[in-house]
């Protein structure tokens, strides 16, 4: 019996494949985190195995992307060994009309921001449900905090009008721990009118390592959607 994937899964696969097709031989590639980016890593591995793509190296943004890269045969390197990144491919939790993003649903936004901003070209892969008129409409802003500062940072964010909530683990007792060994506060704001300024304000709070607002960095947004039961990919 043949099992057919559901349209949403097929759509994510198509978006991942479209992003992987933009990678050229000889590239240094930033490898993001998330379900759609996982398909990108898989298809990069397929292109390498077929010989269509050669001489690329990836820089993973999380343990997840590192494990997947090894699984699919994508060679890896580190920022210590390169002087640039040609292209980065990553997902997002929200995308506004200016291509500003909220990221960090996987608690990997700190490493993702380092890699994505370094890239000469940053490709975002999302489904149409991630498109919003204004950041913060659906998704909270993740803020990575060193553990000893969680209380003062929480209080400082409340003074800014935010509603912070410590992210708790799933299938694990206690809070989520990032790859850097820190906590994550998910912060809701009534309205994010100026994401550029809010990103700076949050990062200026002592004890905050990084937040999930990404501004002025996305070059191309590949959007997957399902129409009449068929997966489609369009570009913003």
Curated annotation (Swiss-Prot):
GO terms for MF: ribose-5-phosphate isomerase activity
Stored InterPro entries: NagB/RpiA_transferase-like, Ribose5P_isomerase_typA_subgr, Ribose5P_isomerase_type_A
Keyword line: Isomerase
Assigned EC number: 5.3.1.6
GO cellular component terms listed in the entry, alphabetical order: cytosol
Pathway: Carbohydrate degradation; pentose phosphate pathway; D-ribose 5-phosphate from D-ribulose 5-phosphate (non-oxidative stage): step 1/1
GO biological process, one term: pentose-phosphate shunt, non-oxidative branch
Reaction(s) catalysed (UniProt annotation): aldehydo-D-ribose 5-phosphate = D-ribulose 5-phosphate
Transmembrane portions of the chain: none
Positions with a binding annotation for substrate: 33-36, 90-93, 103-106, 130
PANTHER family tied to this protein: RIBOSE-5-PHOSPHATE ISOMERASE
Function: Catalyzes the reversible conversion of ribose-5-phosphate to ribulose 5-phosphate.
Family listed: Belongs to the ribose 5-phosphate isomerase family.
Protein name, as recorded: Ribose-5-phosphate isomerase A
Source species of the chain: Trichormus variabilis (strain ATCC 29413 / PCC 7937) (Anabaena variabilis)
Gene, per the UniProt record: rpiA
